[in-house]
Design a protein with these regions (language model features):
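Residue-level detection of the helix-turn-helix DNA-binding "recognition helix"
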Residues: 18, 44, 48
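Short amphipathic alpha-helical interface segments
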Residues: 5-31
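Short, cationic-aromatic polyanion-contact patches
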Residues: 3-10, 56-73
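Short amphipathic alpha-helical interaction segments
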Residues: 34-45
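A local structural micro-motif
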Residues: 25, 37, 54-55
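A short, conserved structural fragment
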Residues: 47-57
């Protein structure tokens, strides 16, 4: 795995999240076809760039969704 591949995988995840819905990890994994390692790296990339947010559901399940960054100034 290299930075270029992680960036490509982050693009795959971003396009899935672009429908403005909340996705669970399992849903993202199934829809993206990425391995756990590749999906984790892609989510980490998007989180580091402040492109996504996380929302906790009941139990141990978290959802991932695109964050809206609006800067007025």
């Amino acid at each position: 795995m290299n930075k270029h591949q992680i960036g490509l995988n982050a693009g795959i995840v971003w396009h899935l999240l672009n429908n403005n819905e909340r996705w669970t990890y399992c849903e993202l994994k199934k829809a993206s076809g990425l391995s756990d390692r590749d999906l984790d790296a892609a989510i980490g990339w998007l989180a580091r760039e402040d492109k996504i947010d996380f929302d906790s559901l009941q139990g141990d399940m978290d959802c991932v969704f695109l964050s809206v960054n609006v800067f007025i100034g």
